[in-house]
Every structure is written in structure tokens, then in C-alpha cells.
Amino acid sequence: MVSESHHEALAAPPATTVAAALPSNVTEPAAPGGGGGKEDAFSNLKKKFMNELNKIPLPPWALIAIAIVAVLLILTCCFCLCKKCLFKKKNKKKGKEKGGKNAINMKDVKDLGKTMKDQALKDDDAETGLTDGEEKEEPKEVEKLGKIQYSLDYDFQNNQLLVGIIQAAELPALDMGGTSDPYVKVFLLPDKKKKYETKVHRKTLNPVFNEQFTFKVPYSELGGKTLVMAVYDFDRFSKHDIIGEYKVAMNTVDFGHVTEEWRDLQSAEKEEQEKLGDICFSLRYVPTAGKLTVVILEAKNLKKMDVGGLSDPYVKIHLMQNGKRLKKKKTTIKKNTLNPYYNESFSFEVPFEQIQKVQIVVTVLDYDKIGKNDAIGKVFVGYNSTGAELRHWSDMLANPRRPIAQWHTLQPEEEVDAMLAVKK
């Protein structure tokens, strides 16, 4: 006992001495486990997670596989998003670069074009000496209308000008099929009284005519005239289109020999359709009797043909088939009027089987005591007719034994003759 107490007594002072020897600002090291709060929390979460994981009724390898798949899906989504963003940025950058180089605002284009045009005009004006009030004419491209070959000769013995229309070539195509139906009108200016025209050649751009026309003109008067050769495209359903024309001043031609030459067609001046007047007549057909009755009722606003500003009109009626005149009738002459009233009836025998093959041609003429009676205008109904004329003929056939009256606009004689010459 004594020895133990003595032992304790001996051991105590050194402990006190050690404690006193430590500096006052030194902290005593923490006991193990006292400063590991974070590690404990992580351990607890880990234990809970493992406990929850153990509760899932799946083997560990299955859970690992699911985790790997989930990670792969997440990585794939991230990759796609990144790629899409990069692609958009690339396109945007490319678009900006392209826009900066090529895409120009329309307003900028207009302004730039206007500025450049104004500057160019100023430069041109400065070079040519044009003022602001003057305009510089731009050179127009010459339109190719084809060419025509013709011949000219003069018969001094009979005082006749002989005009030959030989052929045309390289005409422009005016029809939808890539061709034209050309014919040529020939007349002398300034009177335009006597007009000729060639036959219509179907579906060709290089027609060969080989036709000759004669004008009775004294040589002393020939020098003041101009020959016009106008090439037209025939159209059954509308006005004929002019392709081009060529004019020859007679005072420039040497009639000491026959002239034959090719010349390029030139653009023709558009002339307004001359108003020739209107005529009213009725048609009546009786199929059982084979009788066709035409009643010429009246005409109005006829073209002035005489010097006094009037005319002496009368009407000719022709029954035609296949270009041949089968019968001819005519009205009385009405003196000094442009609005004659006739009310004259004419009958023709036409069998029922022939009624669809015939034509009634109505021509209004101006009577002249001295010279030839000039045609004012013309119209025809029946086979190969069109428009109002075809409608009138159809109405007559649809209403047998009943007279059908209708007004018709007179057409130039040469145009109607051209239509009559066309065979279907």
C-alpha cells in the first residue's frame, strides 16, 4: 500500500510539469471520430443507398446494366444537343458570310442600280454633250420578219404595171404549231383602190406563190405611186395578223428591164380597221321543199365612196359551193345614201343533202355609171363561216320554215375572198 501511494506521489509532478510546459495557444488534438462529421454523413447515405438497393428484387448485374444504359442514353442526348448547337452556329456563320457577300437588300439593289444608271447617263451625256432636257435614244434590235422575192415590169403598149409575187422565206411563226398561214396583199398608194392578194398557203414559213397581178396605170402617173406588198398570217377565227411589208417607190424603179429581187420585210404601221358599214338580212330554209330564201332588209353607216360624200349602193347575192358560183341575184340601186332600205326577197333551190355544203355571199357595191362598180364590203354565211355568220346559219337550220334576221358587219372584200378560198 505504502509503495503504491508513493508511486502515485512520485508520478504526479511530472504530469503537472508537462501540462505547464505546453503553450497556451496550442489546441489539443481532437479525439478520433470527433471531427469526421462529413465522413459519417457520407457513410450513412451510402448505407441507406445500399439498403434501398438491396430491397430492389433484381440481381446486381441487372442493376449495373441498367445504370450503364442510362449513362449511355444521357451521353447520346448530350452529344446530339452539342452537335445541333454547333450545326446551327456553323449555318448561321455561313449564312452571314454568304449574305455579306451575295445577299443584298432589294432596296439597296434598286438604289445602287439607280445610282449606277444615273452615273452612267451622266457619263454618256458628258461624252456626247447631251443636256438634262435631252434623251439619248437606245439602239433598237432589228426584228427579223422574213423576206420576199418579187418582180416588176411595165407594159408600155397597154399601160400596165406587172407585179409578180414569187415567194417568201424565213417568215416568223405566228400560230401555236410553230408555223403560219401566209398570203400577200398587193396594192398601190396613195389610192389603195385596187387590191390584190395571193392564195393562202397553209402551215409554212417559206411559201412559194408564183402569182402575177396587173395594175392599169398610165406611165405618166406611175412615178407618184408606191407599191406595197404586205404579208399576212391568215386566221379563221380572228383578224388576220400582218407579218411585215415592203414598199417600193415607183420613181426609183428602172422599167427599162424586168426587176427581180429579194428584200427583207419591214415592220408595218398598224392601221385601224376601216369601218365599212353593216347589213341586215334574213335567212329561211324549208327542208321538205329544198328552198332557201334570203331577204335583204337594209344597210347602215356604209362607207362614203362618191365625191359628194355619199354612195349609190346595191347588193349582190351569190350561192356558192366548192368555190363555184351556182346562182347570182342582186337588189335595186339606192341613189345617194349611206343607209339604204331594200326589203327585197330572193330564193334559191338547195336540196337538204346539200344545205351544209353551200355558202351565201352578200356583197354591197357602189354603183358607178362610168367605171367599175367598187365593192364597199362583203360577208358570207354557210359552210366554213365563223362567228356571227356561223351562228346565223346555225339558227336558220335549227328553226326550219322560220325567217331568222340578223345584222352583220361588212368586211373588206379581199379578206372574205381569202376565207372563201380556204378549203377544209
From Swiss-Prot:
Residues 144-263, 275-408 form the C2 domain. Signal peptide: none annotated. Ca(2+) 4 binds at residues 306, 312, 366, 368. One of its GO terms (biological process) is calcium-dependent activation of synaptic vesicle fusion. Gene3D superfamilies: C2 domain. Residues 83-424 are cytoplasmic. Calcium sensor that participates in triggering neurotransmitter release at the synapse. May have a regulatory role in the membrane interactions during trafficking of synaptic vesicles at the active zone of the synapse. It binds acidic phospholipids with a specificity that requires the presence of both an acidic head group and a diacyl backbone. May play a role in dendrite formation by melanocytes. This is Synaptotagmin-1. The gene is SYT1.
